[in-house]
From Swiss-Prot:
Gene for this chain: murI
Keywords attached to this entry: Cell shape, Cell wall biogenesis/degradation, Isomerase, Peptidoglycan synthesis
Catalytic activity annotation: L-glutamate = D-glutamate
EC number: 5.1.1.3
Name of the featured protein: Glutamate racemase
Length: 283
């Protein structure tokens, strides 16, 4: 058995690395749906269908758990797949399996509260708001998942999402540092204009953006805290396996990288982040 990690492209490698560092003995299969990346601008039904196909591929390859290392898939497809598709597929395989996303641990990190906690709404006006900026794909921003779920738990946090329609595609294509920095700066300034000031904290709400986290740090005021999805997801997954011993993550330390796109090495931007050559096999 193994842990499957699924993303529309290479952004999920940021989560994959954090999971491997936390669970080094586990076997991992990474699947990038690069033939259909990015997901952020696709209709919801397409995102659900593509995410389901990716999960099926990973379960058929022996995964006991699939982590959706993609905010768009987690926001739009996860709950629906858990409720309507997963029970039947679990029965067909005849073994324990599950699918988890990355938004729940991110919201727990952003609020400092467990997912199960929902604040009592008292109705009084909160004088001092913590301004949280979320940089994401258009699909994630349109879902308003961060605004809705954080507001349930913390009325003293105001969430402002900034959709970045081109950024994930640019990272997939290996755009240069100057081009990427210009795009990041543009979105940071757009968010600042809408809010009236810089955010107090920020979530990089697309796993691709972790690859260029240094550019966001440079564009935001010095010291602005970034909530890192890979770290919060690794924390959550470690606890999840402790609570669910029926799910086997494997013990061989295997690493497999698959793509629905063109097999072979990844672009220089990705390999610089990874720290060396990285070849994907055909899914």
């Amino acid at each position: 058995m193994s842990i499957g990690v699924f993303d529309s492209g290479v952004g999920g490698l940021t989560v994959h690395r954090a999971l491997v560092n936390r669970l080094p003995q586990a076997d991992f299969i990474y699947l990038a749906d690069q033939a259909n990346a990015p997901y952020g601008g696709r209709p919801g039904e397409e995102i659900v269908a593509l995410t389901r196909a990716g999960c099926e591929r990973l379960f058929d390859a022996g995964a006991s758990l699939v982590v959706l290392a993609c905010n768009t898939a987690s926001a739009i497809a996860l709950r629906r797949l858990q409720q309507t598709w997963l029970p039947g597929y679990r029965k067909a395989l005849g073994r324990p399996i599950n699918v988890l996303g990355i938004i729940v641990p991110t919201i727990e990190a952003a609020t400092g509260l467990p997912w199960e906690h929902e604040a009592e709404r008292r109705g009084e006006k909160v004088e001092q708001l913590d301004i949280l900026g979320v940089f994401s794909t258009p699909g994630t921003a349109a879902s308003r998942v961060y605004e809705i779920e954080i507001d349930k738990r913390r009325q003293d946090v105001a969430v402002f999402s900034e959709p970045c329609p081109n950024l994930a595609r640019m990272i997939e294509a290996g755009a240069g540092a100057v081009e990427l920095a210009t795009e990041v700066e543009r979105h940071v300034q757009q968010l600042k204009t809408r809010i009236g000031r810089y955010p107090d904290r920020a979530i990089l709400g697309c796993t691709h953006y972790e690859i260029i986290a240094d550019l966001f740090r440079a564009a935001l005021p010095a010291g602005t805290p970034l909530i890192h999805q890979p770290a919060s997801t690794a924390d959550a997954l470690e606890l999840y396996f402790q609570r669910h011993p029926e799910l086997d993550p494997g013990t061989g330390g295997g690493r497999v990288f698959l793509t629905t796109g063109t097999p072979g090495p990844q672009n220089a931007l990705v390999e610089t982040f990874w720290g060396g050559p990285l070849r994907f096999e055909a899914a």
